UniProtKB/Swiss-Prot annotation:
It is found in: Endoplasmic reticulum membrane. The keyword Mitochondrion does not apply. It catalyses: L-cysteinyl-[protein] + hexadecanoyl-CoA = S-hexadecanoyl-L-cysteinyl-[protein] + CoA. It comes from Aspergillus fumigatus (strain ATCC MYA-4609 / CBS 101355 / FGSC A1100 / Af293) (Neosartorya fumigata). This is Palmitoyltransferase erf2. One of its GO terms (molecular function) is protein-cysteine S-palmitoyltransferase activity.
Length: 607
C-alpha cells in the first residue's frame, strides 16, 4: 500500500469507482469515509461523492429552500436524475465541506407515512423527471447505512423493495401529539416514534392468523364512528388516490401508542376472576364466630348468651302453659296478649343485640412500616397516641381535644370513642362495654338493641311477677280457699312470682344505669375512665347539652351500615381481611410450638 503512486484528487474521483468492483464503506453521520470525496475549493473541477450527496453540485438543492429533499439513492438513481435542471441557489449553497447533517434528520417519518410505505405495492415503472418526488422515495432505500456507492454499470439494476422507512426519511416534520396511523383507523393516538419496534417479533413474519382466532383484534368497530382527522392525516393520500390501496398485512405489528382521546373504542379485556373464593367472614381474623352464611356472629368465648336466652324463654313458656289460659278466661284476654308482646320485644332485641355486628372497624387500614433488620433495636418507634379536635354541640365556636390511639393489633388509628375489645379481639366503634350475657360487644350498631333488651326484660320480669301473683290471688278469692291452698293448687304460677322477683332487679338496675349514661352523653368506658381524674378535669365532649337531646341522639339515630359486609363474596387482595381462610390457618400456634419443643427420641442406628 505504501508503494502505490500518489494521484491527484480529481483523477482519483474519476477513476477509483470504475476500477474497483467492491462497494465503498458507508458514510456515517454525513461525513465521508474517504478524504478524496471532499470537493475542492473551486467547486468546478471535482464534486463531493458521499453517501448523502451522490449527484453533481449543479443538481443539489439548497437546504434552506422549502420543498421535498432529494432522494439519497445509488448511482442508478443518480443517472436518472441528472436531467433535472439545477437550482438557482445551488451555487450559493456549495462549500468545500460536505453537509454534516442528514437532510432527513429534521424530517423524521411519521407512523402514517411508515404504514403507507409498507402497504404500497411495488411498481415496476421507471420514474421520470416529471413524476412526483414521492415515487423516488418509494423505489429507493432511504436509509443512510444502505446508501453505499456501487460501481456504475450499464445493466439495468433490480429495483429495491419498498423501504420500511426510518425517522430520518419523512419529508414533513410530523406532529408527535396527534399524528399516528391507528390500526383501528378511527382515533388518533400519541405516537412513540420508535420504528425499530416493527422488528420486535420476527417469529410472526408471514404468518397470517385467521380473524376469528385473533384474540387481540377488535371485531366490533362501529363503522359509523367518524375518524378524527388532522392536517397531517392526509399524508397517505399525496398521490391523489381517494380510495385506500390494498395492504399486505403479513409481518405487520401494531405500533405502541397511548390513547389521546377519552372516547377510545378499544375494549378493555378484564382478567377472568378466580373461582368461588368464599365470603368475607371466612377470611376475618378477629375472635368472632359466624353462622348463617355470615348473617349472624358472636364472640368466640363461653356461650353464656345461651343461658340468657333460656332465662327468658323458659319462664315465659311456663307462663303461657299455666297462667295464660286461666287469665284469658277469668280476668281478661289482654293480660296474656300484653305479656306475649313484651316477650316478643325482649327476645327479638336479645337476638339482635347478640348476633349483630356491633360496629367492627376494618383492620390494616394504617399499617406501620416494618422495622429495618439492620436498625437499632433500642430506637424509639413512631408515636401511637394523638389528639383530635372535636367541635362541641353546646357552642358554635368551642372545641375540645380528645385522645386517639393507634391499635397495634388491628393496625389502625382508632377514631374517637373507639376501643379494642380483648375478648372479641376487634376495634369497635363507640364501644360501650363487652356484655357477657350477650357474648358480644355493645357498640354503635347494637346499643339500641341492648337498651331495648334491658328495658323489655325489666318490664317482662315485673309483668311476670304481677300476672302470676294475680293468678294466685284471684283464684283464692274466687274459690274461697286459703292462701296456702291456692299456692298448693297453682305451684308453677307461684314459682314464677319468685322468679320474677329475683330476675327483675338486675335488668332494672342496668336500665336505670344506662338511662343515666345516655343522659350524660357518655359510654360506660368513658364514665369509668373519667373517674381517674378530679372532678374539675372531667369533660364530656360528646354531650348534646341536655338529657332529652342526649336520649334522642342515641335512641333515635339510624343504625349505620356495617364496614366489612361479611356476607359479600371475598375479593382476592383485600387488605382488611386475611389471605387464608380461618379453617386453613393453624388453630393454636402455641400448641404447635409446644409440639416442636417436645423431646424427640434419637433415631436408632442401622446395622
Amino acid at each position: 500500500m505504501s508503494s502505490a503512486p500518489e494521484t491527484s484528487d480529481a483523477d482519483h474521483v474519476s477513476t477509483a469507482q470504475p476500477a474497483l468492483g467492491i462497494p465503498r464503506p458507508p458514510s456515517v453521520g454525513g461525513i465521508s469515509s474517504r478524504m478524496t470525496d471532499v470537493a475542492s475549493e473551486d467547486g468546478e473541477q471535482s464534486q463531493a461523492n458521499t453517501g448523502i450527496s451522490s449527484r453533481p453540485p449543479q443538481s443539489q438543492r439548497s437546504l434552506s429552500r422549502r420543498g421535498p429533499p432529494p432522494a439519497r439513492s445509488s448511482i442508478t438513481a443518480h443517472s436518472q436524475m441528472t436531467s433535472r435542471p439545477g437550482s438557482s441557489a445551488s451555487r450559493l449553497s456549495r462549500s468545500h465541506i460536505p453537509s454534516l447533517t442528514a437532510q432527513g434528520f429534521f424530517r423524521p417519518m411519521s407512523s402514517q407515512r411508515l404504514q403507507a410505505h409498507r402497504g404500497r405495492p411495488v411498481t415496476k415503472e421507471t420514474a421520470t423527471p416529471s413524476e412526483d418526488w414521492n415515487d423516488q422515495l418509494d423505489q429507493n432505500r432511504q436509509s443512510i447505512i444502505s446508501n453505499g456507492t456501487f460501481p456504475q454499470s450499464s445493466a439495468p439494476q433490480e429495483e429495491a423493495p419498498p423501504s420500511r422507512g426510518t425517522e430520518f426519511t419523512d419529508p414533513i416534520i410530523p406532529d408527535r401529539n396527534t399524528s399516528n396511523a391507528s390500526p383501528f383507523g378511527n382515533t388518533t393516538s400519541r405516537s412513540v416514534g420508535e420504528s425499530a419496534k416493527l422488528l420486535h417479533d420476527r417469529d410472526r413474519v408471514y404468518k397470517i392468523t385467521p380473524q376469528h382466532l385473533d384474540l387481540g383484534a377488535n371485531h366490533n368497530i362501529e363503522k359509523s364512528d367518524p375518524s378524527q382527522r388532522s392536517p397531517l392525516s392526509f399524508l397517505s393520500l399525496q398521490n391523489g388516490n381517494t380510495a385506500p390501496e390494498p395492504r399486505d398485512n403479513r409481518a405487520h405489528e401494531r405500533l405502541s401508542s397511548a390513547d389521546s382521546s377519552p372516547g377510545s373504542i378499544q375494549k378493555q379485556h378484564h382478567a377472568p376472576t378466580s373461582a368461588n373464593l368464599g365470603k368475607n367472614y371466612e377470611y376475618f381474623t378477629g375472635n368472632t364466630l359466624f353462622f348463617g352464611g355470615g348473617r349472624f356472629q358472636n364472640s368466640r368465648d363461653k356461650p353464656i348468651n345461651i343461658a340468657t336466652g333460656i332465662f327468658v324463654v323458659l319462664p315465659s313458656a311456663l307462663f303461657f302453659a299455666y297462667s295464660a289460659p286461666w287469665l284469658w278466661h277469668h280476668i281478661s284476654p289482654a293480660v296474656p296478649i300484653l305479656f306475649a308482646y313484651l316477650f316478643y320485644i325482649c327476645f327479638s332485641s336479645f337476638i339482635h343485640a347478640s348476633v349483630v355486628d356491633p360496629g367492627i372497624i376494618p383492620r390494616n387500614l394504617h399499617p406501620m412500616p416494618p422495622p429495618e433488620p439492620s436498625g437499632d433495636p433500642l430506637l424509639i418507634g413512631p408515636p401511637t397516641n394523638d389528639w383530635v379536635m372535636v367541635k362541641l354541640a353546646t357552642s358554635d365556636v368551642a372545641a375540645m381535644d380528645v385522645p386517639v390511639k393507634y391499635c397495634k393489633t388491628c393496625n389502625i388509628w382508632r377514631p374517637p370513642r373507639c376501643y379494642h375489645c380483648r375478648v372479641c379481639d376487634n376495634c369497635v366503634e363507640t364501644l360501650d362495654h363487652h356484655c357477657v350475657w350477650l357474648n358480644n360487644c355493645v357498640g354503635r350498631r347494637n346499643y339500641r338493641y341492648f337498651f331495648a333488651f334491658v328495658s323489655s326484660a325489666t318490664l317482662l320480669a315485673l309483668f311476670l311477677l304481677g300476672a302470676s301473683l294475680a293468678h294466685v290471688l284471684v283464684y283464692r278469692a274466687r274459690e274461697g280457699v286459703s292462701f296456702g291452698s291456692a299456692i298448693d293448687k297453682w305451684r308453677v304460677p307461684w314459682a314464677m312470682v319468685i322468679y320474677g322477683a329475683l330476675a327483675a332487679p338486675y335488668p332494672a338496675s342496668l336500665w336505670a344505669y344506662h338511662l343515666f349514661l345516655i343522659g350524660r352523653g357518655e359510654t360506660t368506658r368513658e364514665y369509668l375512665n373519667s373517674h381517674k381524674f378530679a372532678k374539675a378535669d372531667r369533660h364530656r365532649p360528646f354531650t348534646q347539652g341536655n338529657i332529652f337531646r342526649n336520649w334522642i341522639s342515641v335512641l333515635a339515630r339510624p343504625r349505620p351500615p356495617t364496614y366489612l359486609q361479611f356476607k359479600r363474596p371475598y375479593q382476592e387482595g383485600d387488605q382488611r381481611l386475611s389471605a387464608m381462610k380461618r379453617k386453613d390457618r393453624p388453630r393454636d400456634v402455641e400448641a404447635q410450638a409446644d409440639i416442636e419443643m417436645q423431646h424427640v427420641p434419637p433415631t436408632p442406628r442401622q446395622g
